[in-house]
Amino acid sequence: MDSKYVIKYYDCFLEDGKLNIVMQYAPNGTLHSRLHAQRGKALPEDKVWQFFIQALLGLRHVHSKKIIHRDVKSLNLFFDQDDNVLVGDLGIAKVLSPNTMFARTIVGTPYYLSPELCEDKPYNEKSDVWALGVVLYEMCTGGKHPFDAQNEGALIRKIMKGVYAPLPGGKFSSQLSDVLRACL
């Protein structure tokens, strides 16, 4: 895919029964590792906006090709040498046919599953935007998930209720809180 915000894939091959993917080098790691390095502290709001918008632009490009990513998470958002976000790991992405508007297979990482996926309903690119909302929350809380539980069943119930702790008071703009609410 030819986008400044989608990681480039060059090749893949099997070796010893394992799939190896050759992709663009991302020298500045992943958003997940960056959040871990923050040691529980939120990113500054200007960085949150930058990374969120760049990830959104990458997803817009993916969606324009009728592809649903299906595994949007901080571990799959990489940084290039200029600290631009690159949407990566489209290994479980779903290409929709021209006549198809929704996918049905449940895949992805539990913390990032949209309510539609939790309810085993058809879903579309809005599920990717929902997962990006989870990433947005992580950036604002130093890596915390908006929906957390001791087991998958309890996690799914929390996701379906849609109730999460508000962002730290006074730390982020009302616009950012509004965008988060629109995503989740």
Q: Residue spans of the language-model regions?
A:
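A conserved loop-to-beta-strand element in the N-lobe of protein kinase catalytic cores
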Residues: I7, D16-Q24, H32-S33
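Activation-segment/catalytic-loop signature of the eukaryotic protein kinase fold
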Residues: C12
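AlphaC helix of the protein kinase catalytic domain
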Residues: H32-L43
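Activation segment signature within eukaryotic-like protein kinase domains
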Residues: F51-F52
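Protein kinase catalytic-loop region centered on the HRD/HxD motif
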Residues: L57-I67
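Conserved catalytic-loop aspartate of Hanks-type protein kinases
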Residues: D128
